[in-house]
Amino acid sequence: MSKYTKEIEKRRTFAIISHPDAGKTTLTEKFLLYGGAINLAGSVKGKATARHAVSDWMEIEKERGISVTSSVLQFHYDGYCINILDTPGHQDFSEDTYRTLMAADSAVMVIDGSKGVEAQTRKLFKVCVMRHIPIFTFINKMDRDANDTFDLLDEIEKELGIATCPINWPIGSGKKFRGVYDRNTNKILTFSDTQKGTKEGSFEEISLDDPHVLEVMDPEQKDQLLEEIELLDGASAEFDQEMVSKGELTPVFFGSALTNFGVETFLEHFLKMTTSPLPRMADCGLVDPMSDDFSAFVFKIQANMNKAHRDRIAFMRICSGKFDASQEVYHVQGEKKMRLLQPQQMMAESRHVVDEAYAGDIIGVFDPGIFSIGDTICAPGNKFAFEGIPTFAPDHFARVRLLDTMKRKQFVKGINQIAQEGAIQIFQELYGNMEEIIVGVVGVLQFDVLKYRLENEYNVEIRLENLPYEHIRWIANKEEVNVDKIAGTSDMKKVTDLKGNPLLLFVNAWSVGMTEDRNPDLILTEFSK
């Protein structure tokens, strides 16, 4: 047993995923509220006087009320050390969300009770399934009129292909929402209105057999609840921890993050059901988190978190052992020993220096420009590399025009920094130079973020000219193919990425297929490692 086992077993590192506006950021805030990390939960709604969400810190986020970066939030609760990877809630930022999911051991899926499973939920769910991590479901906004509860469960099972096991059950919805019935204790948790959820909610626990239960709900609601419980006991899957751990069964909870209904109950159950840090695959095999030897990988790079200092932070997920700020480590890709500078942990925009951290924790270190996403850091005696983080094909492309050529140096620095963070991808025409830059993004809002950040952080103005391309492909067998001799369609464009890899841009799927037909030895792929 590792001498760090006790500390590592306390860790719970998870991401919260959802479709935009399902209430993910509000739920995150309430976790922090119950954990004592904040004293007053602020509404994420966009009035000028409203408090900004704790996990939204970039200026453009505060102005628009969306999360466009991934925040890392740590707090303690009931003996656990919790690391929340708060992923971007806006649908345009799924690639950054994907990388963040690579650092999580489990995921909380937030679903709007009035809308059910939505587009981004499906996409992010597939990523979790691919990683075989446990998935927990919180059906939110039950204080509003919601879809039929059984229909919601059926939709999750059919749309996402995962079995469901409700741990609690809502009593009504909308104006008739009275709380939740806990299937484990056979009791009802009733919640009071807590100043629109800005304070920890107080609740009363009452047995379903208690005559006073009719003070909480009317006889019709009680009869309906009893009928639903009977149906649920006969039809739903039984809780199976092994199936949950494999990502084959999702425990389901109901509540309202805005008013605190069901939030603490969910948090307590979740922490017991979810996993401590999981082993990670590397080129040497699985790396045990309980190992005494330190190891970590970079899953995110964020430049200019402090505008005044133009700093750059590399976020690392610790995979095994203990991090000690005084220790020397080995940067595998850089092939050199080093000390990690200014190690810190984050609470949105605030940060504090850390001397030690354990497997499951996320730390940010000062990056002088040597780290890339996916890099491995380990103890000097262990020179292995964790599996790389894939780069996925962007869906939108534009040519970048610099409006003031005298600011070329700032422009090149800025756009390269933003690209290294993974918010955008940069391409150049084959045999071109930095004078002609094509930017690819997963969602069109990232174009706005690019313009905003270049102007506000680097004092550079650009114009973006949209390009008609909708598909991009890496060449998997580039060593065996002469790129110059690829016979494509007239609208195909040959480009390279920042690593010098050749790629092909296509206007439509037909062009992709035609190029593959004309070049039978060519192997194209939608992502690059």
Identify the meaning behind each predicted range.
Residues 1-529:
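Structural and coupling elements of P-loop NTPases
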